[in-house]
Amino acid sequence: MEISKFADEQLADQIAAGREAVPEVDPIRLIEQVVHRARAGAGVDFDVFESLIGEIDLVEINYLERGLMASRAVCRINVPAPVGDSSDWGTGFLIGPRLLLTNNHVIDSAEDALKATVEFGYELDAEGRLKRTTRFRLSPQDGFVTSPRDALDYTVVAIEENSEDGATPISDFGFLRLDARTGKTEVGQYATIIQHPDAKTKRISLRENKFVKYGDEADPERDNFLWYSSDTANGSSGAAVFTDAWQVVCLHHAGVPDRRMIDGKEHWVLTDKTTAPARIAINLPVDKVHWLANEGVRISKLIADVQERIAAPGFARSTLVDDLVADATGVKAFAGTTPGESIVGPPLVAAPALRLVAAEARRRPTRHTHPANYFDGREGYRSDFLPVEIPLPTLGVNALRHGSPAKVTGAADDVLRYQHFSVVLNANPKRKMAFYTAVNIDGARWTNLERGNDVWFYDPRIPEELQNGDELYGDEPVPSKNYFDRGHLVRRLDPVWGEIRVAKQANDDTFQWTNCSPQYWGFNQGADLWQGLENFLLYNTDDENVQASVFSGPLFRADDEEHRGILIPQFFWKVIAVTDKNDRLYTSGYMVSQQDYALDIPFERLPVGPNSTKPGQNFQVPVAKIIEDTGIVFADEILSADAYSGPSTGRALRTVADIQHPRR
């Protein structure tokens, strides 16, 4: 949790006084609040006046429905750490068409925004079960404004128009309108926060919450903030703080601990009434610290800061952000919306007929594809990536017996070029999968991108009928699993390196049907040895030069059996090339079998027999054997650098310790 930088006793005294305060009966301010409430769409009657001055604590029943509507726009944000597998979490909410608001200390740069995943609907349903979530990516190139954490600590960033799986538009979640005018609440009135505390399911804090201090006209810096008593935790950063009319009053930003000076050093009061030095207390669980209040950034000040930043010379203007400012300041409402309405979006429940139509549409498989120019500029596999040049292999006679390469629109050859990898596809209608793939890996520049919802796309450069899609994989009568998984030939993370935008492009490129092959689910999800070969060889060849070029593909055989019109491979192969610090090339070849599961496919029961990761299922083999079996012809440099010296038929691998490779 971010900690308030205001640490003086005066603030503590003002907060304490605010906890006991009742709303002032100032006719002018009262009228302002009633006008705000009416504009927000919450409804106004005589009881509202009594509620605003603290005489009664009743609200209309539509308060609950409007709260549910508001909650749709609130999301959980995940930002992977620069290194390792850890992540930072926060809360955010939609504030306009395709615009998200959170804290700067959650997303502080466009680079972080590109890595982030935004998840809507991570919450429990009426029966206590998790709902299906929807994930989106951010697009800071379409709009990005931020203020540092030691200033107003906010980030406004554009979000993609459609979800990762392409099935849900962001407009389905509505948005929470920001109003730059003041007068929406008063000290002593109630506050509500919708949040994802500790990255958990969506929660609402609505009991015993009051606004306890509102700005400070005598101090311009403090005047940017508002203080309130409410339960929050780590992960709540970036949450929306509401009035009873569900108007956003401020952006949750920090906690205010109960501070004491002891022997000239700052201590914090803990919930057990003891104290601890601030440097220790800041690392304690939030429920161990006695918090005086929470601190939020006032929306009026936030919008004013956005206006100032976008007006600065050289700032990259965004239509989305310009429209936000125009709407929030009352100049021009968002197109198609009612001015001032605080919650914008579709109703909670559609008409029954519409629900049936929507459900039927969801049941129909969606065929995802990219625009024709989507892959323009992709360089693909580079033969000069390693110090020793390694060209793409060619298709020999044995390979061409199983089909011919698919013709690629706009290419002089038959190579599909993606970000950091290439694919040559077999156009045989009984195969429709890669002859081989080739990828360059730079382990020193790997980027930790979280895996989102797997959505596979058809490549527009090759006719769709030459690509195996969902029709090969789904609706199989095997309990809880499809018998064949969509298996990556180029591993998802292998090409994900370099500058964030490039790494994300590479990640997305791996989800092309051209890079997919049918792999028995137990093999695909459990083959730790097979999936870990690249990592092992990268980091066991040279400490500094962690680069590799990897070739992989299915082994086509005459005795492959047919499933749904496609001949299923029984084996997959892989050739890995690395260099040491002296630029010496080393290669090694491997095969893995799913033979037990690709013959006599038993869809009436789960498969039994040896798991493909057990001894005898993974083999290290001579590169020459892979060439002989596949008909994929590699350059002489690959053959002569083979580190394997065992039997010509290969050697079974039990663990990576059995691999014959150049030792450091």
From Swiss-Prot:
Note whether Iron-sulfur occurs among the keywords.
Answer: no
Signal peptide positions on this chain: none
Q: Which organism is it from?
A: Sinorhizobium fredii (strain NBRC 101917 / NGR234)
Keywords attached to this Swiss-Prot or TrEMBL record, sorted alphabetically, are: Plasmid
Q: Which Pfam families match?
A: Endonuclease_NS (PF01223), Trypsin_2 (PF13365)
Q: Keyword Nucleus on this protein?
A: no
**Disulfide-bonded cysteines:** none
* Protein's UniProt name: Uncharacterized protein y4fB
Which GO molecular function entries does the Swiss-Prot or TrEMBL record give?
endonuclease activity; metal ion binding; nucleic acid binding
| Annotated InterPro entries | DNA/RNA_non-sp_Endonuclease_sf, Endo_G_ENPP1-like_dom, ENPP1-3/EXOG-like_nuc-like, His-Me_finger_sf, Non-specific_endonuclease, Peptidase_S1_PA, Peptidase_S1_PA_chymotrypsin
| UniProt cross-references to Gene3D superfamilies, sorted A to Z | Extracellular Endonuclease, subunit A (3.40.570.10), Trypsin-like serine proteases (2.40.10.10)
